[in-house]
Amino acid sequence: MAASCVLLHTGQKMPLIGLGTWKSEPGQVKAAVKYALSVGYRHIDCAAIYGNEPEIGEALKEDVGPGKAVPREELFVTSKLWNTKHHPEDVEPALQKTLADLQLEYLDLYLMHWPYAFERGDNPFPKNADGTICYDSTHYKETWKALEALVAKGLVRALGLSNFNSRQIDDILSVASVRPAVLQVECHPYLAQNELIAHCQARGLAVTAYSPLGSSDRAWRDPDEPVLLEEPVVLALAEKYGGSPAQILLRWQVQRKVICIPKSITPSRILQNIKVFDFTFSPEEMKQLNALNKNWRHIVPMLTVDGKRVPRDAGHPLYPFNDPY
Protein backbone atom coordinates (compact mmCIF):
# COMPACT_ATOMS: atom_id res chain seq x y z
CA MET A 1 0.00 0.00 0.00
CA ALA A 2 1.86 3.05 -1.21
CA ALA A 3 1.15 5.95 1.15
CA SER A 4 -0.04 9.09 -0.58
CA CYS A 5 2.69 11.49 -1.66
CA VAL A 6 3.49 15.16 -2.08
CA LEU A 7 5.09 16.23 -5.37
CA LEU A 8 8.29 18.19 -4.74
CA HIS A 9 9.42 20.93 -7.13
CA THR A 10 12.22 18.56 -8.18
CA GLY A 11 9.61 16.17 -9.61
CA GLN A 12 10.20 13.66 -6.80
CA LYS A 13 7.27 12.10 -4.98
CA MET A 14 7.72 12.30 -1.21
CA PRO A 15 5.44 10.01 0.84
CA LEU A 16 3.24 11.91 3.30
CA ILE A 17 4.02 9.43 6.09
CA GLY A 18 7.58 8.41 6.89
CA LEU A 19 9.24 6.58 9.74
CA GLY A 20 10.98 8.94 12.15
CA THR A 21 14.16 7.61 13.79
CA TRP A 22 15.01 10.34 16.33
CA LYS A 23 15.36 8.75 19.79
CA SER A 24 15.10 5.22 18.32
CA GLU A 25 17.77 3.30 20.19
CA PRO A 26 20.40 1.32 18.34
CA GLY A 27 19.38 -2.28 18.94
CA GLN A 28 15.76 -1.42 18.11
CA VAL A 29 15.84 0.76 15.02
CA LYS A 30 16.90 -1.95 12.55
CA ALA A 31 13.86 -4.08 13.32
CA ALA A 32 11.62 -0.99 13.21
CA VAL A 33 12.86 -0.02 9.74
CA LYS A 34 12.51 -3.57 8.42
CA TYR A 35 8.99 -3.83 9.79
CA ALA A 36 8.01 -0.41 8.41
CA LEU A 37 9.24 -1.36 4.94
CA SER A 38 7.29 -4.63 5.15
CA VAL A 39 3.99 -2.83 5.81
CA GLY A 40 4.37 -0.25 3.05
CA TYR A 41 6.46 2.63 4.37
CA ARG A 42 8.55 4.12 1.58
CA HIS A 43 10.02 7.10 3.45
CA ILE A 44 12.62 6.91 6.22
CA ASP A 45 13.81 10.06 8.04
CA CYS A 46 17.36 9.89 9.44
CA ALA A 47 20.08 12.21 10.74
CA ALA A 48 23.76 11.84 11.50
CA ILE A 49 23.27 13.21 15.03
CA TYR A 50 20.74 10.51 15.93
CA GLY A 51 23.64 8.07 16.18
CA ASN A 52 21.77 5.19 14.56
CA GLU A 53 22.45 5.51 10.81
CA PRO A 54 24.78 2.45 10.72
CA GLU A 55 21.98 0.27 12.05
CA ILE A 56 19.40 1.76 9.68
CA GLY A 57 21.93 0.98 6.95
CA GLU A 58 21.91 -2.70 7.93
CA ALA A 59 18.13 -2.79 7.45
CA LEU A 60 18.35 -0.99 4.10
CA LYS A 61 21.10 -3.32 2.90
CA GLU A 62 18.98 -6.38 3.68
CA ASP A 63 15.69 -5.14 2.23
CA VAL A 64 16.37 -2.48 -0.41
CA GLY A 65 17.87 -2.84 -3.87
CA PRO A 66 17.93 -5.14 -6.89
CA GLY A 67 16.27 -8.48 -6.15
CA LYS A 68 15.19 -7.37 -2.66
CA ALA A 69 11.81 -6.50 -1.15
CA VAL A 70 11.93 -2.78 -2.03
CA PRO A 71 13.50 -1.29 -5.18
CA ARG A 72 15.78 1.64 -4.26
CA GLU A 73 13.88 4.02 -6.54
CA GLU A 74 10.68 3.38 -4.55
CA LEU A 75 12.26 4.48 -1.28
CA PHE A 76 12.64 8.08 -0.09
CA VAL A 77 15.50 8.53 2.38
CA THR A 78 16.24 11.81 4.17
CA SER A 79 19.26 12.65 6.30
CA LYS A 80 20.60 15.83 7.88
CA LEU A 81 23.89 17.71 8.04
CA TRP A 82 24.94 18.30 11.65
CA ASN A 83 25.93 21.71 13.06
CA THR A 84 29.66 20.86 13.38
CA LYS A 85 29.85 20.18 9.62
CA HIS A 86 28.70 23.54 8.21
CA HIS A 87 32.14 24.63 7.01
CA PRO A 88 32.07 24.18 3.21
CA GLU A 89 35.04 21.78 3.33
CA ASP A 90 33.22 19.53 5.81
CA VAL A 91 29.91 19.18 3.97
CA GLU A 92 30.77 16.48 1.44
CA PRO A 93 32.76 14.35 3.92
CA ALA A 94 29.77 14.51 6.30
CA LEU A 95 27.44 13.34 3.55
CA GLN A 96 29.86 10.59 2.49
CA LYS A 97 29.89 9.30 6.08
CA THR A 98 26.07 9.24 6.14
CA LEU A 99 25.96 7.44 2.77
CA ALA A 100 28.49 4.87 3.99
CA ASP A 101 26.56 4.36 7.23
CA LEU A 102 23.22 4.02 5.43
CA GLN A 103 24.87 1.85 2.72
CA LEU A 104 23.35 4.02 0.00
CA GLU A 105 24.75 5.60 -3.17
CA TYR A 106 22.58 8.71 -2.91
CA LEU A 107 20.06 10.43 -0.63
CA ASP A 108 16.66 11.57 -1.83
CA LEU A 109 16.79 14.59 0.48
CA TYR A 110 19.56 16.20 2.56
CA LEU A 111 18.61 18.85 5.10
CA MET A 112 20.63 21.44 6.98
CA HIS A 113 19.61 20.39 10.50
CA TRP A 114 19.88 23.86 12.13
CA PRO A 115 20.73 27.34 10.78
CA TYR A 116 23.75 27.91 13.05
CA ALA A 117 27.15 26.23 13.05
CA PHE A 118 29.06 24.69 15.95
CA GLU A 119 32.86 24.58 16.16
CA ARG A 120 34.35 22.19 13.58
CA GLY A 121 35.50 18.77 14.68
CA ASP A 122 34.24 15.38 15.78
CA ASN A 123 32.69 16.41 19.10
CA PRO A 124 29.02 16.95 18.16
CA PHE A 125 28.43 19.36 21.07
CA PRO A 126 31.68 21.33 21.55
CA LYS A 127 31.50 23.30 24.80
CA ASN A 128 33.23 26.24 26.43
CA ALA A 129 34.50 25.99 30.01
CA ASP A 130 31.22 27.45 31.31
CA GLY A 131 29.18 24.73 29.59
CA THR A 132 27.89 26.90 26.74
CA ILE A 133 28.28 25.77 23.12
CA CYS A 134 31.33 26.76 21.04
CA TYR A 135 29.92 28.21 17.84
CA ASP A 136 31.55 28.65 14.45
CA SER A 137 31.04 31.76 12.32
CA THR A 138 30.18 29.90 9.08
CA HIS A 139 26.96 31.37 7.68
CA TYR A 140 24.26 29.04 6.39
CA LYS A 141 24.48 30.68 2.95
CA GLU A 142 28.07 29.40 2.61
CA THR A 143 26.97 25.95 3.75
CA TRP A 144 24.14 26.00 1.21
CA LYS A 145 26.56 26.56 -1.68
CA ALA A 146 28.52 23.48 -0.57
CA LEU A 147 25.29 21.48 -0.37
CA GLU A 148 24.41 22.49 -3.93
CA ALA A 149 27.61 20.83 -5.14
CA LEU A 150 26.32 17.49 -3.80
CA VAL A 151 23.31 17.70 -6.11
CA ALA A 152 25.58 18.42 -9.08
CA LYS A 153 27.58 15.28 -8.19
CA GLY A 154 24.45 13.12 -8.05
CA LEU A 155 24.96 12.29 -4.36
CA VAL A 156 21.75 14.01 -3.29
CA ARG A 157 18.50 14.43 -5.26
CA ALA A 158 17.00 17.33 -3.30
CA LEU A 159 18.06 19.78 -0.59
CA GLY A 160 16.10 21.22 2.28
CA LEU A 161 16.17 23.02 5.60
CA SER A 162 15.23 22.11 9.15
CA ASN A 163 14.41 24.50 12.01
CA PHE A 164 14.74 27.61 9.79
CA ASN A 165 12.33 30.55 10.12
CA SER A 166 10.59 32.40 7.28
CA ARG A 167 13.27 35.10 7.04
CA GLN A 168 16.07 32.54 6.90
CA ILE A 169 14.24 30.55 4.20
CA ASP A 170 13.97 33.70 2.07
CA ASP A 171 17.65 34.40 2.72
CA ILE A 172 18.55 30.97 1.31
CA LEU A 173 16.21 31.48 -1.66
CA SER A 174 17.99 34.75 -2.46
CA VAL A 175 21.29 32.91 -3.10
CA ALA A 176 20.16 29.43 -4.13
CA SER A 177 20.78 27.98 -7.56
CA VAL A 178 19.32 24.72 -6.20
CA ARG A 179 16.17 25.78 -4.38
CA PRO A 180 15.24 24.07 -1.12
CA ALA A 181 12.44 21.55 -1.66
CA VAL A 182 11.42 20.88 1.94
CA LEU A 183 11.35 22.55 5.34
CA GLN A 184 11.24 20.22 8.35
CA VAL A 185 9.99 21.73 11.62
CA GLU A 186 8.21 20.76 14.80
CA CYS A 187 4.49 20.79 14.04
CA HIS A 188 1.34 19.44 15.74
CA PRO A 189 -2.05 20.94 16.66
CA TYR A 190 -0.52 22.80 19.65
CA LEU A 191 2.03 24.34 17.22
CA ALA A 192 0.06 24.50 13.98
CA GLN A 193 2.67 26.61 12.11
CA ASN A 194 -0.03 28.01 9.79
CA GLU A 195 1.93 31.13 8.75
CA LEU A 196 5.16 29.23 8.20
CA ILE A 197 3.42 26.53 6.14
CA ALA A 198 1.71 29.17 3.99
CA HIS A 199 5.06 30.94 3.56
CA CYS A 200 6.69 27.70 2.39
CA GLN A 201 3.90 26.55 0.13
CA ALA A 202 3.87 29.97 -1.59
CA ARG A 203 7.57 29.47 -2.36
CA GLY A 204 7.38 25.89 -3.58
CA LEU A 205 8.63 24.18 -0.41
CA ALA A 206 6.84 21.18 1.06
CA VAL A 207 6.69 21.00 4.87
CA THR A 208 7.56 17.99 7.02
CA ALA A 209 6.31 17.86 10.61
CA TYR A 210 8.57 16.35 13.24
CA SER A 211 7.14 15.44 16.65
CA PRO A 212 3.67 15.35 14.98
CA LEU A 213 2.20 13.65 18.05
CA GLY A 214 3.38 16.40 20.41
CA SER A 215 6.44 14.63 21.83
CA SER A 216 4.81 13.90 25.20
CA ASP A 217 7.80 11.63 25.99
CA ARG A 218 10.15 14.61 26.28
CA ALA A 219 12.05 14.65 29.57
CA TRP A 220 11.29 18.30 30.34
CA ARG A 221 7.48 18.14 30.03
CA ASP A 222 5.68 19.92 32.87
CA PRO A 223 3.46 17.31 34.58
CA ASP A 224 0.57 19.82 34.62
CA GLU A 225 0.66 20.49 30.87
CA PRO A 226 -2.20 19.09 28.82
CA VAL A 227 -1.32 16.11 26.63
CA LEU A 228 -2.24 16.48 22.97
CA LEU A 229 -3.15 12.80 22.58
CA GLU A 230 -5.66 13.19 25.45
CA GLU A 231 -7.45 16.31 24.16
CA PRO A 232 -11.26 15.74 24.20
CA VAL A 233 -11.68 16.70 20.51
CA VAL A 234 -8.93 14.25 19.53
CA LEU A 235 -10.49 11.45 21.59
CA ALA A 236 -13.96 12.19 20.18
CA LEU A 237 -12.70 12.00 16.58
CA ALA A 238 -10.77 8.81 17.35
CA GLU A 239 -13.99 7.26 18.59
CA LYS A 240 -16.01 8.51 15.61
CA TYR A 241 -13.55 7.19 13.02
CA GLY A 242 -12.57 4.03 14.91
CA GLY A 243 -8.93 5.09 15.03
CA SER A 244 -6.29 5.97 17.60
CA PRO A 245 -5.61 9.53 18.83
CA ALA A 246 -2.28 9.36 16.97
CA GLN A 247 -4.09 8.59 13.71
CA ILE A 248 -6.29 11.66 14.24
CA LEU A 249 -3.24 13.93 14.66
CA LEU A 250 -1.53 12.45 11.58
CA ARG A 251 -4.67 12.66 9.45
CA TRP A 252 -5.00 16.37 10.34
CA GLN A 253 -1.51 16.94 8.93
CA VAL A 254 -1.78 14.89 5.75
CA GLN A 255 -5.09 16.56 4.99
CA ARG A 256 -3.14 19.88 5.10
CA LYS A 257 -0.56 18.27 2.74
CA VAL A 258 2.01 18.30 5.55
CA ILE A 259 4.39 15.32 5.58
CA CYS A 260 4.71 13.53 8.94
CA ILE A 261 7.52 11.41 10.36
CA PRO A 262 6.13 9.81 13.53
CA LYS A 263 8.78 7.86 15.41
CA SER A 264 7.96 4.43 16.74
CA ILE A 265 9.73 1.13 17.31
CA THR A 266 6.48 -0.69 18.19
CA PRO A 267 5.14 -2.72 15.24
CA SER A 268 1.46 -2.13 16.05
CA ARG A 269 2.02 1.64 16.19
CA ILE A 270 4.21 1.72 13.09
CA LEU A 271 1.38 0.01 11.20
CA GLN A 272 -1.31 2.24 12.71
CA ASN A 273 0.58 5.44 11.84
CA ILE A 274 0.47 4.75 8.09
CA LYS A 275 -3.25 3.89 8.06
CA VAL A 276 -4.49 7.46 7.72
CA PHE A 277 -5.60 7.52 4.09
CA ASP A 278 -8.97 5.77 4.36
CA PHE A 279 -10.91 8.52 6.17
CA THR A 280 -11.30 12.28 5.73
CA PHE A 281 -12.27 15.02 8.18
CA SER A 282 -15.03 17.49 7.39
CA PRO A 283 -14.06 21.18 7.22
CA GLU A 284 -15.74 21.59 10.64
CA GLU A 285 -13.62 18.81 12.15
CA MET A 286 -10.45 20.34 10.69
CA LYS A 287 -11.52 23.63 12.30
CA GLN A 288 -11.93 21.94 15.70
CA LEU A 289 -8.41 20.53 15.48
CA ASN A 290 -7.02 23.87 14.24
CA ALA A 291 -8.52 25.49 17.34
CA LEU A 292 -6.09 23.53 19.56
CA ASN A 293 -3.21 25.76 18.41
CA LYS A 294 -1.38 27.42 21.31
CA ASN A 295 1.90 28.19 19.48
CA TRP A 296 3.58 25.83 21.95
CA ARG A 297 7.04 24.81 20.87
CA HIS A 298 8.28 21.73 22.72
CA ILE A 299 11.58 21.02 20.98
CA VAL A 300 13.96 23.78 22.04
CA PRO A 301 17.53 22.65 22.83
CA MET A 302 18.16 23.46 26.49
CA LEU A 303 21.25 23.77 28.70
CA THR A 304 21.61 23.89 32.46
CA VAL A 305 23.56 27.02 33.42
CA ASP A 306 24.00 27.87 37.12
CA GLY A 307 21.40 25.24 37.97
CA LYS A 308 18.75 26.77 35.65
CA ARG A 309 17.42 25.33 32.40
CA VAL A 310 17.83 27.90 29.63
CA PRO A 311 17.46 27.73 25.82
CA ARG A 312 20.90 26.68 24.61
CA ASP A 313 21.17 28.80 21.47
CA ALA A 314 18.72 31.67 22.03
CA GLY A 315 21.51 34.27 22.10
CA HIS A 316 22.93 33.20 18.73
CA PRO A 317 22.26 35.72 15.92
CA LEU A 318 20.96 32.90 13.68
CA TYR A 319 18.68 31.36 16.36
CA PRO A 320 15.44 30.68 14.44
CA PHE A 321 12.80 30.86 17.15
CA ASN A 322 12.99 34.54 18.15
CA ASP A 323 10.99 35.53 15.04
CA PRO A 324 7.17 35.23 15.01
CA TYR A 325 7.51 32.38 12.45
From Swiss-Prot:
UniProt-recorded name of the protein: Aldo-keto reductase family 1 member A1
A GO MF label = L-glucuronate reductase activity
Q: Which Pfam families match?
A: Aldo_ket_red
Q: What is its main location?
A: cytoplasm
Question: Sorted alphabetically, which InterPro entries does this protein's record hold?
Answer: AKR (IPR020471), AKR1A (IPR044481), Aldo/ket_reductase_CS (IPR018170), NADP_OxRdtase_dom (IPR023210), NADP_OxRdtase_dom_sf (IPR036812)
Write down which residues bear the modification named N-acetylalanine: A2
Q: Which residues carry this modification: N6-succinyllysine?
A: K127, K145
Q: Name one GO cellular component term.
A: apical plasma membrane
The catalytic activity of this protein is classed by the Enzyme Commission as 1.1.1.2, 1.1.1.372, 1.1.1.54, 1.1.1.19
Q: N6-acetyllysine occurs at which residues?
A: K127
Keyword list (alphabetical) reads: Acetylation, Cell membrane, Cytoplasm, Lipid metabolism, Membrane, NADP, Oxidoreductase, Phosphoprotein
Sites marked Lowers pKa of active site Tyr: K80
